[in-house]
Amino acid sequence: MRSTHPKVIALFSLIAALVLALAACGGDDESGDGGGGGGGGGGDGGSASEFDFSGKEFTVGSKEFTEQLILGQITKQVLEATGAKVNDQIGLAGSVVAREALTSGEIDMYWEYTGTGWITHLGETEPIPDPEEQYTAVKDADLEKNDIEWLEPAPFNNTYAFAVREETKEELGVESISDIGGVIEENPDEATLCIGTEFSTRDDGLPGVEKSYGFEWPGDGLKKMQEGVIYQQLDDGDCNFGEVFQTDGRIQALGLALLEDDESFFPVYNPSLNVRKDVLAETPELKDLFAQVAEKLDTETMQRLNAQVDVEGLTEDEVAKTWLEDEGFLG
């Protein structure tokens, strides 16, 4: 029998080694690295089934507007998928009520915005423009002063804005919030503003806007109502200006225009699940679970989810369930 040349044996050995190395790399990619919250598209966010909260009980709250109701449902449903019992307190009447419910122990968690925490709850007067610095500042201060934990924030920014119809923008010649001052001075009858009751009294709401921009809105031009009604009232022409949330899907659906915040008054409003320190200490895995949830909630996603409720007519629990399934959190 003719023997195989040593160089041929070496070549076969090299090929075999390469094949084994490539197979090992492929196996690592498929199994994942086990890190907290991977990037990428739908279905890569992790599964609630990876967490076992059987025997645990949580009370979940939220504020009363669409985005908050969706976030509340996402929180409730993902916790239920871990085996936890969840008491539903979703839909509390505003920031102050929700915050008091959290600090008093009536609820264990709800999503709050960094700007609201900094200005409204901590009483600071100067917002921090950089989102990461703002999050770190409110997180550290609230934990030290109030034993409230701010979990990993979502990337979307639901800051306030003033919206107008495109035709109103052209007729009144307004491009920025500063331009409103000219309308108030020269044509006060046109300075009509649909505004939420809470926004009318918040330091980061109308009082702060008036102070920062140097104008005072005529009292007879203010129409106070629930935030959810403002968009249709604005589109119907009942007001020339309206206070809106930038992530609301109705802005695009109704073709509304946003005025530039040329004084950079409005703070950053990244949402974070707020949890009392004692609750997180008992279940520290909440941090990992909701880091995976939060990273998937970018601005485009939140606008789409809001529009599914406010424009398409779906319920918040339906929207939350579908999104959690699409992202792989619910099996």
Question: What do the PLM-derived regions correspond to, one by one?
Answer:
Residues 55-56, 67, 200-204, 208-212, ...:
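An extracytoplasmic/periplasmic, membrane-proximal ligand-sensing/linker region
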Residues 55-92, 156-231, 314-318:
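Bilobed "Venus flytrap"/periplasmic-binding protein-like clamshell domains
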Residues 160-170, 270-283:
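A bilobed periplasmic-binding-protein/Venus flytrap-type ligand-binding module shared by bacterial periplasmic
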Residues 108-112, 239-245:
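Paired acidic/hydrophobic, glycine-rich loop segments that form the ligand-binding mouth/hinge
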Residues 20-24:
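C-terminal motif of bacterial Sec signal peptides marking the signal peptidase cleavage site
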Residues 25-52:
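Short, low-complexity, disordered segments immediately C-terminal to signal peptides
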Residues 1-12:
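Bacterial N-terminal signal peptides that target proteins for export
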Residues 121-151, 238, 250-263:
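Ligand-binding "clamshell"
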